[in-house]
Amino acid sequence: MGALPDARGSGAARALLDDFVVRAGAQGLPEVELECFAQNARALKFYQGRGFAAVRELRGWNQPADASRRASAREPAPEPRVVDRDAAFEWLADVERRIADLPLQVTPSSLAAAVRPLTCWRLGSAQIVFSVVDGTPTQVHSLVDTDPAQRDAQVLLRRLRAVHAADEIVIPALQRDDLGGDAARREGFAPQVLHQVLMVRALEKP
């Protein structure tokens, strides 16, 4: 959500957010969530004032193209299993049922609307969903490893670097450290300057 400079202080943002919360409650949803850049103190204060609490940090990661070329010289990583879109979404939906606070954008509800063509790999306890479009960075849409050690996620990232060695690889600021972010750090990805927090507000039952 954003507000034009002229609308600041008018109460429009507060009214929109409150309407969103009321509509969600009327549909029987237990909570609502949003993401906010951690460095945006004004927005954080606004959301906290409307009952939202930060529950998770969400980081973004980059791997420049030149670093990817160097990575391609490493020993080849194990071959992941390519899974079709339906199977990948079913796996993610199961994870979403078992693990709380998974950002909406990395789940099937949002991925189903992706315009870029999605490729899905799975290895052990981890799955990665990414897209490759000529002339643009390789984009990771979802990376989840249900094993705290995140070894399989690290192997998937290493394999992605090797296969798309000439491309920049971008993981948007939606990545939880405990579900794949630590693997990105170990694999040499650089953290983006700005990161987000996942904020949640519980709703009262009607």
Pin down the residues of each PLM region.
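Catalytic cores of nucleotide-enabled group-transfer and carboxylate-activating enzymes in metabolic
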Residues: 62, 193, 197-203
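Amide-forming acyltransferase catalytic core, primarily the GNAT-like/NAT-type
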Residues: 49-136
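Conserved acetyl-CoA-binding loop-helix of GNAT-fold acetyltransferases
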Residues: 3, 9-22, 45-49, 148-162
